[in-house]
Amino acid sequence: MTYKIKTTNPYSGQSEMLTPEEHRLYIEIKQAEWDEDYDTVRKGLYKFGLLNAKAYMTLLD
């Protein structure tokens, strides 16, 4: 059984349970935002939306 990681949107306070793969991608996107690497952000958002659309809307939209 795959464990889930509770991840919270820092702006809304809403949370989602992510798989380890989704969580790694979420962290990569947030770091790319911080680094102003918008190509990586765009690609990460696209992939995350395909993996978990509900969590995308809660955490990244």
Give residue ranges: language-model regions.
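N-terminal acidic leader/helix
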Residues: 1-34
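Short, charge-rich amphipathic interface segments used for partner binding and complex assembly
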Residues: 31-61
